[in-house]
Amino acid sequence: MGFKCGIVGLPNVGKSTLFNALTKAGIEAANFPFCTIEPNTGVVPMPDPRLDQLAEIVKPQRTLPTTMEFVDIAGLVKGASKGEGLGNQFLTNIRETEAIGHVVRCFENDNIIHVSGKVNPADDIEVINTELALADLDTCERAIHRVQKKAKGGDKDAKAELAVLEKCLPQLENAGMLRALDLSAEEKAAIRYLSFLTLKPTMYIANVNEDGFENNPYLDQVREIAAKEGSVVVPVCAAVEADIAELDDEERDEFMQELGLEEPGLNRVIRAGYKLLNLQTYFTAGVKEVRAWTIPVGATAPQAAGKIHTDFEKGFIRAQTISFEDFITYKGEQGAKEAGKMRAEGKDYIVKDGDVMNFLFNV
């Protein structure tokens, strides 16, 4: 599994349309608030042309992409942090994800009602972010109350945690995002168990009309907000993506050519999510299967091996490693080996994105 990204937004911004296109799950996207109550989950393959290039050389029995999970979380509304509009359940569902894809409506359409009567991305973002911040404020205050007693008793870990929580508190009181705070890795680790919603990596998915990718003041608003808090923006037209998702490969390529698109916008959403979580891919390439594996950036060779099986990590000896570029240039493992491009990497090797690896282990 790659990662779990929760898709959030106000009702009627195009969340379920986007989710349907992402997963081809075909859940009902009714023009009505709260048509999604239980979160719908879809597992989506990670688009990576490198996998096909490797398969062309190796000719395996099958190819397996890495995947990620998208969760369509029901439309949040003002007051969700106090339980309005089924809010408590929604917030719990978001808490269980690793990242947030916040869909924002950046198009006019009289046939699709807007919950507040007008299209205003800045207001929409503020409503959602305020609800998330209020939920986090409640979590933070409870944690401070709980940790204070231990800290007074001289508990070092409790003191460290309390210091971080007291840094977070004023930010949340002002409905600010914790991800905009400059927290160190140690500080984040101290409060990780609390699963703060506003600390989760977030991308804004700007849902635009077919002609709304340029000269769109709504889109500009979203970009401005994202820049201030260090988030990314991915513009897509959910309606077009839904059409593309229904086509077979040949029709899809033709349709995208007509629209002047190089690839479905959803590929950008998936890749942005991947990057957001600091993930990368390595490959295994054998005649039985060519496969992509997800690891965090900075993972060592044994940690990468452990993704396949824990025994590979426990008994790790070394990793026969070829860069993706060399594997393609020299037409596979044998050619790369003959050209002196296969390396034997040890326990301290930091895996690079695209490495083609074969692990030697002994248990």
From Swiss-Prot:
Residues 3-256 form the OBG-type G domain. One of its GO terms (molecular function) is metal ion binding. InterPro entries: ATPase_YchF/OLA1 (IPR004396), Beta-grasp_dom_sf (IPR012675), G_OBG (IPR031167), GTP-bd (IPR006073), P-loop_NTPase (IPR027417), TGS (IPR004095), TGS-like (IPR012676), TGS-like_dom_sf (IPR023192). ATP binds at residues 12-17. Its cofactor is Mg(2+). Mg(2+) binds at residues 16, 36. Changing residue 12 to A: Shows similar hydrolysis activities in the presence of K(+) or Na(+). One of its GO terms (biological process) is response to oxidative stress. Residues 278-361 form the TGS domain. ATPase activity is stimulated by potassium and other monovalent cations. Stimulation is maximal in the presence of K(+), followed by NH(4)(+), Rb(+), Na(+) and Cs(+). One of its GO terms (cellular component) is cytoplasm. It comes from the Bacteria. Keywords: ATP-binding, Magnesium, Metal-binding, Nucleotide-binding. ATPase that binds to both the 70S ribosome and the 50S ribosomal subunit in a nucleotide-independent manner. Does not hydrolyze GTP. Monomer. NCBIfam families: redox-regulated ATPase YchF. Belongs to the TRAFAC class OBG-HflX-like GTPase superfamily. OBG GTPase family. YchF/OLA1 subfamily. This is Ribosome-binding ATPase YchF. It comes from Escherichia coli (strain K12).
